[in-house]
Amino acid sequence: MQIDAVITWVDGKDEAHLQKMLPFLEDKSQVNNKSFRTRFDQVEEIKFTVQSILKYATFIRNIYIVTDNQVPNFIKNKTQGTFENVFIVDHADIFKEDLGFLPVFNCRPIETKLYNIPNLSEHFLYFNDDMFLLREVKESDFFEEGKPIIRGNWLQFNENIFYKRWFNSEKKKNRAGHKKAQEKSAKLVGFKKYFKFHHTPAPM
């Protein structure tokens, strides 16, 4: 079974990327606040993500870095014979017939297009750029008989938890995010609970 790795990445310090984003922000001053900078700034962590995969997941065939017309510094400066199975994939390559929706700054629509990565294997591991492998892993840690092993736990919807019904602010209740996306997905398929995925590489 061939298995690839896919990493979504953005360099929020890139001035060209920032200029793309500004027209879509209601409050343009938020680009300077701490929470915004924490989410979008990068400190070369993508290099450690890639190196950890190369060192500890030797079964990985290719590594694809999905980004918006950007290239990590370690790839720009690579020497011959290094990172030969690491490839940059632009958003335009995966949005194809939906180019009119670019630029995109939300991970949800990007994730729905990962299947369009050219030459991507049927099975792959999806990483965020802040995920690192710390010891050797095997195919069987992520797939069993070709099916993905999902790590997490089943939880109640917030509205079914007494204290969260009464003490959560309206702003927090309606805030978009990873947890809210999982809750809504579970409801759409008729589940009474939702499965909260841990922040780990996701087999697909």
Short names for language-model regions:
Residues D4-K13, Q19, H91:
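Short loop/turn segments at strand-loop or loop-helix junctions that form parts
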Residues G12-R39, G152:
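A solvent-exposed, charged loop/short amphipathic helix patch at secondary-structure junctions
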Residues K13-H17, V71-K76, K96-D98, F132-E136, ...:
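Short catalytic/ligand-binding loop motif for oxyanion handling, primarily in non-cytosolic enzymes
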Residues V31-R37, D41, V71-L120:
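Active-site-proximal specificity loops/subdomain of glycosyltransferases
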Residues S52-I60:
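Short, acidic, metal-binding catalytic loop of nucleotide-sugar glycosyltransferases
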Residues R61-Q70:
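Short beta-strand/loop segment that forms part of the nucleotide-sugar
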Residues V71, K113-F157:
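GT-A fold catalytic core of metal-dependent nucleotide-sugar glycosyltransferases
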Residues I150-M204:
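Long, charge-rich alpha-helical interaction segments
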